[in-house]
Amino acid sequence: MSAGMSAQLAQAERAALCDLLLDVGPDAPTLCEGWTAAHMAAHLVLRERRLDVGLGLVLPGPFARHAARATERAAGQVPFERLVARIRSGPPRLIRLVDGPMNIVEFFVHLEDVRRATDDWTPRTGLDDLQDALWPFQKSGTKLRTRRVKDVELWIARPGGEPMAVRTGGRQVTAIGDPGELTMFFFGRRDQSRVELTGDPDVVAEVRSAPIGF
């Protein structure tokens, strides 16, 4: 898929998330523990516009604490509609060239974080292009987020597709699902994703409960 198509899909997810945020309001729950829709909006604004906060999203300790404080402050002090308007305006000029690879997964996940924070959610349909765009990120992203899963040979597959190895060695398990569902599962939203795990029952249980993330 071209970079231009990837960027278009990222922009579509951005717009859909902005519409949803305004629809549910700042106090709506999300799948991110402790975060309301206002925290989500603040996070997305700061992530693209504040390098000091961006570092805290990948580095632990004081960096992470600084990012958490900045997010809490923005969520509480900046009007919600203004935060959403900043998100909708798109990324700053310096990062527009990497909008697709930088943002397509981010905005898909956070849109679903808001959508799936209710008991009656269902997967979106008609997302073939988006699913195709998310698939190339699965191997590297899943490998990174499962680095603390030990002694497991992990494969992933789309429904009806050929499995792809993510981690080799150890006891084998295969995760099967649409790329969007695999994304949600390995971003830690396991209870709010539709992924089938096949393999030894003990290994399947391990993958379902093992720590996942950065």
Region roles according to the model:
Residues 10-19, 75-86:
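Short, charged, amphipathic alpha-helices and their helix-cap/turn boundaries
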